[in-house]
């Protein structure tokens, strides 16, 4: 879904943890132990509004709020990432005033201007997908939310403008794009390779743009890059059927290694294989076939159970005939991927394994002091830190990085588990995670990343609020408790929307 975060970052400053949690409507609702799903959905909506109000007051039109110092940051080129990332969530929540404010902002963005390096991947999954999703929703099931059709049409116009700014990244000998580009000089960072997820997480958004505009160029560019991932060369780069290496040579499309994982940097390549089939099963059956191979190989070769907790299931990584017994919060989308694939393909074995993965990721949440899972962990009995031996014996893992940067993947998979099985326990887990995040990360203007989920109050607060708080954490928390709708994930082959890796619902192709 996105690359792992290492601390400290230049955009984050470590601050004390003695910030009082403001008691707004959400806090009152939480203290009253809401019983109904509607009350819980309303609590999530209030939390979204709390963060939105803080962003508008202190940071708009910049990319992010700094939720401790009440300032702003521009880690995504200064085009207002939080606003664009919030659009689809605001539509789903029916917040017309927020939606209109974002639409007016989008109309004014000049995507040809930035002084910073542009990430093709991040810009695609946040900005391009955010606008395409808003367009699909407002042209479809939410068509009565906004009156100004010109503003809605502007979403598609700006999507095309942005893609036209970015498309030179694909101008390489192979068609495998550069990720880090300079849109002013049409230069790049000189990289010789691109990552698996970065290369393989463009095809949904760029194909959708072609389908909406009738211009095949965008789909062809992204599908050309993807073609090298579907037919990996050399053969050694595919150590198990469907599971491929992590780096691709930009010059010739050949894989540069054979390191296999579902962790950050590799993750969303596998995520999009099955999602492209959901988007259009006629055009993308090959993608589905590759996902099935990868899923079957993952169960056979990467499934791992901690010795101290054999009831838990995590995914290991594989390289040079060695297994790495470690995982990440980013990886926890995996349960949702298996559940989606299982229900779409009517494969109960995939559903069952997806639920095993969901259980494992839930254990990383319920084992910590804050009831939020860490950014990374391991279960190699030979590498247990001396000060975590007791924790490892009880929890089944040891914490490698205890930070929490407002990531959504665990809640995301809880949501898929509830939608596919209908079991209330998974919706309860969404609520538990939301309550923990609201309690631990909330500030007077928004929500902050924290340094250690296994310390009181999450340790120290980082002065950063990623845009995906709006796009993903709030959306999945809300969807789990809201009424059925066209944009909800459905059992079987009934999905009319498919979610990109930033949780933006894209309308499936209509043949």
UniProtKB/Swiss-Prot annotation:
Q: In which pathway does it act?
A: Protein modification; protein glycosylation
Cofactor requirement: Ca(2+)
Glycosylation: which residues?
182, 366, 438
Q: Which UniProt keywords apply?
A: Disulfide bond, Glycoprotein, Glycosidase, Hydrolase, Metal-binding, Secreted, Signal
Q: Which residues form the active site?
A: 375 (proton donor)
Q: Name one GO cellular component term.
A: extracellular region
Q: Which cysteines link up through disulfide bonds?
A: 332-361
Q: What Pfam families has UniProt attached to this entry?
A: Glyco_hydro_47
Localization per record: Secreted
Protein family membership: Belongs to the glycosyl hydrolase 47 family.
Described purpose of this protein according to its UniProt entry: Involved in the maturation of Asn-linked oligosaccharides. Progressively trim alpha-1,2-linked mannose residues from Man(9)GlcNAc(2) to produce Man(5)GlcNAc(2).
Put simply, this protein is called: Mannosyl-oligosaccharide alpha-1,2-mannosidase
Organism of this sequence: Penicillium citrinum
Q: Gene encoding this chain?
A: MSDC
């Amino acid at each position: 879904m996105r690359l792992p975060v290492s601390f400290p970052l230049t955009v984050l400053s470590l601050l004390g943890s003695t910030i009082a949690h403001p008691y707004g409507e959400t806090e009152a609702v939480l203290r009253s132990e809401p019983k109904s799903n509607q009350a819980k959905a309303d609590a999530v909506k209030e939390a979204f509004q709390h963060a939105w109000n803080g962003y508008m007051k202190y940071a708009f039109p910049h990319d992010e709020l700094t939720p401790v110092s009440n300032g702003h940051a521009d880690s995504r080129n200064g085009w207002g990432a939080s606003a664009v990332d919030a659009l689809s969530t605001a539509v789903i929540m029916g917040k017309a005033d927020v939606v209109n404010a974002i639409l007016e902002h989008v109309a004014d963005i000049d995507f040809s201007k930035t002084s910073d390096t542009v990430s093709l991947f991040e810009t695609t999954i946040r900005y391009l997908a955010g606008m395409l999703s808003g367009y699909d929703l407002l042209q479809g099931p939410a068509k009565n939310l906004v009156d100004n059709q010109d503003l809605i049409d502007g979403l598609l116009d700006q999507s095309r403008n942005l893609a036209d700014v970015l498309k030179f990244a694909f101008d390489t000998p192979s068609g495998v794009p550069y990720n880090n580009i300079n849109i002013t000089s049409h230069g790049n960072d000189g990289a010789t390779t691109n990552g698996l997820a970065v290369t393989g997480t463009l095809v949904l958004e760029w194909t959708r743009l072609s389908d909406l505009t009738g211009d095949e160029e965008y789909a062809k560019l992204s599908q050309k890059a993807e073609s090298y991932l579907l037919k990996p060369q050399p053969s050694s780069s595919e150590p198990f059927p469907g599971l491929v290496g992590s780096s691709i040579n930009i010059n010739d499309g050949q894989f540069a290694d054979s390191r296999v994982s579902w962790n950050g940097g590799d993750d969303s390549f596998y995520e999009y294989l099955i999602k492209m089939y959901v988007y259009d099963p006629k055009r993308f059956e090959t993608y589905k076939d590759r996902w099935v191979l990868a899923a079957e190989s993952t169960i056979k070769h990467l499934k791992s159970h901690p010795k101290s907790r054999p009831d838990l299931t995590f995914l290991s990584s594989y390289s040079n005939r060695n297994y790495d017994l470690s995982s990440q919060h980013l990886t926890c989308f995996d349960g949702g991927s298996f559940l989606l694939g299982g229900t779409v393909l009517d494969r109960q074995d995939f559903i069952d394994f997806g639920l095993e993965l969901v259980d494992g990721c839930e254990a990383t949440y319920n084992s910590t002091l804050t009831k939020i899972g860490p950014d990374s962990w391991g279960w190699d009995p030979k590498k247990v830190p001396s000060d975590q031996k007791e924790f490892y014996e009880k929890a089944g893992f040891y914490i490698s990085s205890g930070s929490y940067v407002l990531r959504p993947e665990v809640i995301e998979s809880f949501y898929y588990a509830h939608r596919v099985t209908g079991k209330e326990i998974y919706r309860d887990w969404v609520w538990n995670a939301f309550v923990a995040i609201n309690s631990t990360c909330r500030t007077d203007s928004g929500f902050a990343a924290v340094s250690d989920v296994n310390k009181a109050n999450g340790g120290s607060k980082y002065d950063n609020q990623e845009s995906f708080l709006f796009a993903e954490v709030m959306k999945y928390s809300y969807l789990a408790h809201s009424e059925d709708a066209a944009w909800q994930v459905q059992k079987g082959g009934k999905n009319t929307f498919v979610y990109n890796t930033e949780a933006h619902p894209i309308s499936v192709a209509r043949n």
